[in-house]
Amino acid sequence: MPLVSAKEILDDANKKNYAVGAFNINDMEFLKAIFSAAESEKAPIIIAASEGAIKYAGAEMLYAMTKTMADKSKIPVALHLDHGSNLNSVLIAIKAGFTSVMIDASHYLFEENLKITKQVVNICKPLGISVEAELGRLKGIEDNVSVADRDAVLINPAEAKDFVESSGIDFLAPAIGTSHGAFKFKGEAKLDFERLKKVKELTHIPLVLHGASSVPERASKKFEEFGGDLKGAKGVPFDVLKEAIKYGINKVNTDTDLRIAFLAKVRESFATDKSQIDPRKIFGPAMEYVTDVIKERMKILGCSGKA
Ligand code: G3H
Ligand code: 13P
Ligand code: ZN
């Protein structure tokens, strides 16, 4: 079916209290792996492409591939710009056919973030394109950090209410203690659930967890078994993820887990099939492994069977 807006997918998740995976792509291999998982789990999906992905593959290419896959499928699929840093990136995504955008002006002060976000909403709303924005900064928070330092980094729930009402965004990414990449926590994985609960109570809109990868053991073990070094990487454990969903997270952004899984399998193939010269024999099994990791994740998110 035609691509839908992420709002359409997330409004249902919000109403029924489950989460949908937003999975990052840069190429055909990850895209096909995500679709395989979605078809097999009967789960809606949000395909996310960052500015880096657009630089790597081109917005038109990412759109054409995603649309081709979506048209053949009965699963609801949205194509979303991840961390658009300025209006120009948003316009590039819209022109290519993306159905959803994130404007990430969270590094600016509140008023400037709001001003830029409003501009994006004004452009996107009439086109039926959904808009995500972010408040607070994605930075791991350690236990011994002071209340003032915590407040400086994490979302302020009262500001969130004001921001959502004034901007008209469709969903919000609150900083509650996660960070991007494979190294999220030194000690115990802890998120600020009290803050999350307040943001949900005050805004009622779908909420997004960035930096949500779990660094699942089976993929990280394989990565290291075949010569990789993840240097003690640590993600958001499945039970913490489930709790976050219980308190209002409806979109779970995942890139790092897919990267680790893909390259773990590539490492295995390189180590066990040293004379292989056909890339398809290396990438094929890696795609299947990514699909397995995503299927496991969809069950945790609660989106399996929701398509
Ligand atoms: O949030 C960041 C995503 O993982 C995309 O990463 O900017 O390296 O494409 P990237
Ligand atoms: P991870 O690095 O935890 O996969 O987060 C991805 C993300 O937030 C994309 O926006
Ligand atoms: Zn992110």
Predicted segments, located by residue:
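A general boundary/transition motif marking the beginning of the first structured unit of a protein
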Residues: 1, 151, 282-285
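Basic/polar N-terminal segments that are highly enriched at the extreme N-terminus
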Residues: 1-3, 307
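Alpha/beta enzyme core
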Residues: 4-12, 16, 27-53, 60-76, ...
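C-terminal alpha-helical cap/extension of soluble enzyme domains
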Residues: 225-230, 236-307
